[in-house]
Each structure stands twice: as C-alpha cells, then as structure tokens.
A protein has these predicted regions:
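Structured core of small recognition/catalytic domains
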Residues: 164-255
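Ligand-binding loop in jelly-roll beta-barrel domains
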Residues: 92-93, 106-132, 227-253
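Short, conserved beta-strand element in jelly-roll/cupin
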Residues: 56-60, 70-87, 178-182, 192-208
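Short acidic-glycine-tyrosine-enriched beta hairpin
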Residues: 77, 90-106, 211-228
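Surface-exposed beta-loop interaction hotspot
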Residues: 113-170
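A short glycine-rich, His/Asp/Glu-containing loop-to-beta-strand
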Residues: 28-68, 151-190, 196
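Transition-metal
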Residues: 1-38, 50, 54
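Short histidine-centered beta-strand/loop micro-motifs
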Residues: 65-72, 113-115, 187-193, 234-236
Length: 255
C-alpha cells in the first residue's frame, strides 16, 4: 500500500458489545490455519461482543480450505459474493456460483476451493449450535439467492426479503436473509430486539441507525448489531441497497 497520501482517517466505528461499522479500507489480513492462497479478514468475533464469527475472504487461484469448523457444537454458513467454488460436506460436492450458499450443521466439516483462474469472494460464518430437546439437528442446506423470489417486507414494495434457510423448522437456531431496498426505501420503524446481526453490504449506499446514531454505509461495509441496539436503514443514491445478514431465532433465552 505504501506511504499514505493524506491524513490518516477511518469511517469505521467500534462500540464493543453494542455495534460496529467496519469499512473495507481498514481491514487487515489474518493468518487463519486451514486457508491456502486466500486473504482472510475476521470481521466479528466474541472479542467484539458477537456470539458468532464472520469472515470476508478473497480466494485466489488455487485457494482452498480443506476443513472449516466441524466441531460437534459448531455450525457454519458460506455465501459466494463473486466467483465460483466447489464445496464439500459429508462427502457430497456442490458447485456454488455467485449467490450460492451452503449451511452445515454442527459436527459437519466444510471444505471449499476456488474454481476460477481469478479471485472468488466469500462471506463465511460460524457459531455454536444450541440444540432443542426432542428436535433433531438440521440437515445440510444449499441453494442460490438468484433462485429465491423476493417477498415484499411488511406489505412495502420498496423493501424486499429473501430467506436463505427454512423459517418453519425449529431445528434451526439461526437464519440468513437478504434485505433489498429501492432508493429511498427504509425499514417501517426503528427496531429494538434481542437478536443480534452480522450484516455485509452487497450493493448500494444508505444511512443506518445504530443505537440512535445515523451512520453512512455503502457496499462492502460490515455491520455488527448487538442485542437491543436500535437499528433501521434508509437507502440513498440511485442504486438498490442490499445486504446479507444473520439472525438468531427459535430459542428461548437462557437464565
């Protein structure tokens, strides 16, 4: 990167346990065992206050991971932002192109490798699984967001939702969704809830309310939202704003 061309500054904001905005220009590369020919940045972890770990990964030619997660109590999720991957789980192979994803339940190791001569860009997640008495753990789920219809959000046609995992299966203690806003679209109200989110902006620009602070956000930004932090979004500019995010669900909080 070389010598700076101006005063050092950053758009990133870190409020441990509450929220964080992490801009891409401040990311550093982390050495994570298991990754080859890949640039890995850890976006969130319990050190930030999250109950999960999110990564953004650029996989170069020959890039791969031969065994991500897979511990008895750790589930994982992978989403292809750009490029093409081969993913392997439980001895089954899956080709994932842009918009492709795979969920692996606790105890299932995930292997993946870049299939293109250039770079593939991947959003990766892991979290401990909370079992539910009398309910079997989830199965592997794979799909592509390009095949999932967008549903109007709360009756509004300028805000739409895609569910990447089943919403009617109590085996899942988390889900992934994509929200898309037309320019000038917004949430219907400022939300306050127990769930936490890790969100990666796929396109567009907006203003995000985090703990009652309106913060500019744009494509390739990452947002962590902790429990009970006020949150809502306005889309601005001429392009649709879209982001993928995780959400815990289907469990009663423990005392």
């Amino acid at each position: 990167m070389g010598y700076p061309q101006d005063l050092l500054s950053s758009r990133s904001i870190i409020k441990h346990g509450k929220y964080a905005l992490i801009a891409p220009e401040g990311l550093v590369k982390n050495v994570v065992p298991g990754f080859e020919e890949s640039d890995v940045s850890i976006l969130s972890s319990p050190k930030l206050g999250a109950s999960f770990v999110d990564y953004i990964i650029t996989m170069h030619k020959g890039g791969k991971n031969t065994g991500f997660a897979g511990q008895a109590d750790v589930q994982s999720f992978l989403y292809v932002i750009d490029g093409k991957l081969k993913a392997t789980a439980d001895n089954e192979e899956y080709e994932l192109e842009q918009g492709g994803y795979i969920y692996c339940p606790a105890g299932t190791k995930l292997a993946f490798e870049n299939l293109v001569d250039g770079d593939s860009k991947v959003f990766l997640y892991k979290q401990k699984y909370t079992p539910l008495e009398g309910v079997a753990k989830p199965k592997i789920v794979t799909g592509n967001t390009n095949d999932i219809p967008e549903e109007d959000y709360d009756g509004m046609t300028n805000m739409r939702l895609q569910d990447l995992l089943p919403t009617d299966d109590l085996a899942f203690d988390m889900n992934f969704h994509i929200l898309t806003f037309d320019p000038a679209g917004s949430h219907p109200f400022i939300e306050t809830h127990v769930q936490e989110h890790g969100a990666y902006l796929l396109s567009g620009e907006g203003l995000y309310n985090l703990d009652n602070e309106w913060i500019p956000v744009k494509k390739d930004d990452y947002i962590f939202m902790g429990p009970y932090v006020q949150q809502a979004c306005y889309a601005v500019g001429r392009e649709k704003l879209s982001y993928i995010y995780s959400k815990d669900c289907n469990r009663d909080p423990e005392l």
